[in-house]
Amino acid sequence: MSAAIDELQAIIAELKSELEEQKTTTRNARERIERMSAEVVDSNPYSRLMALQRMNIVKDYERIRDKAVAIVGVGGVGSVTADMLTRCGIGKLILFDYDKVELANMNRLFFTPDQAGLSKVEAAARTLSFINPDVCIETHNYNITTVDNFDQFLSTISASGIAVGQPVDLVLSCVDNFEARMAINAACNEKNMNWFESGVSENAVSGHIQFVRPGDTACFACAPPLVVAENIDERTLKREGVCAASLPTTMGITASLLVQNALKYLLNFGEVSDYLGYNALSDFFPKMTLRPNTQCDDRNCLVRQKEFHLRPKPVEKLVEVEVSDEPLHACNDWGIELVADNVPTTTTKSPENTNVAFGLRLAYEAPDKSEKSETTATAGDGVSEASLEELMAQMKSM
């Protein structure tokens, strides 16, 4: 009897899911747009993105449609990351997660209570497809850390790009455990693929992103956390009734930093941060570059390091700047003149005023003490030559 009830409940859940999917596809979803346009009209969802070209930030923004990004983990950080990339018009998104949406996830962003019970990748795909039907969404509902699934994950990221058989352009790690991070790290080291690692602390007041270029910067195994270094099973550290804290603000900021740097990398503008942290308590953003560990436990990392050192280093081109003799501003109402650096200055300083700044001179310079004393002595000598009676006679005659 109980088995029949369970079967009926499963059928009901499936029908509800199909009904919700039908509602999603029929609620005024816009038509697909073949080409991005910079036309400023209310019906153009790309006008403000294409404005980056007009402002000389991005050379060709529409290239984003030729990019494929894999997001591993569609939780608090990953779902917001997928949302932002979808709104930016990314060409293809590949989502990996094996968890389901729960009401406990509602303190974070993106998911809604009516999606509880759905797999995270399915719920995300429905919402993202409605937000921007131009984006190709591919979902994989499995755990990448198992042996069989890892091989499938490896095959997917290396052959599911925009072009058939080509790798994705970037892998974004948005997982919340070290085992999955190590799996992503191993896969990207093996396939020599660039990827971003991200995370939020258990107390929810700090986060970070790290850009990993195999061989050039440190991989996740080069400087592993203590849990990984000691081969501790994370599941043994969890206690019943105890969970990590979670703030949508910290996760939103971390996701924003992740997507911002992903866009800079994909569209080749600005400076991509190798490591960027965030401390909410002091609003501190540490930034640094982590170099590879020559004794890394990942053998593929060591191979990539050797390849990187053998790779020819790019030579920086010196750009000659033409200097014009013409004045920058033709008008000079105040009569300001520039003095060449090689013209000797005539500014002098008296010994009494050694603290006068360079380039300034005193309007009046006091005489030296020696000169003043000589003048006083001379005047004193003149007075001593006349007698008192003679001085009195001079005063009466006045």
From Swiss-Prot:
The active site is at C243. Zn(2+) binds at C219, C222, C296, C301. GO terms for molecular function: ATP binding; metal ion binding; UFM1 activating enzyme activity. It comes from the Eukaryota. SUPFAM superfamilies: Activating enzymes of the ubiquitin-like proteins. ATP binds at G76, D97, K120, N143, N177. GO terms for biological process: neuromuscular process; protein ufmylation. CDD domains: ThiF_MoeB_HesA_family. It holds the Pfam family ThiF. One of its GO terms (cellular component) is cytosol. Keywords: ATP-binding, Metal-binding, Nucleotide-binding, Ubl conjugation pathway, Zinc. The keyword ATP-binding applies. InterPro entries: D-isomer_DH_CS1, ThiF/MoeB/HesA, ThiF_NAD_FAD-bd, Ubiquitin-activating_enz. Belongs to the ubiquitin-activating E1 family. UBA5 subfamily. E1-like enzyme which activates UFM1. This is Ubiquitin-like modifier-activating enzyme 5.
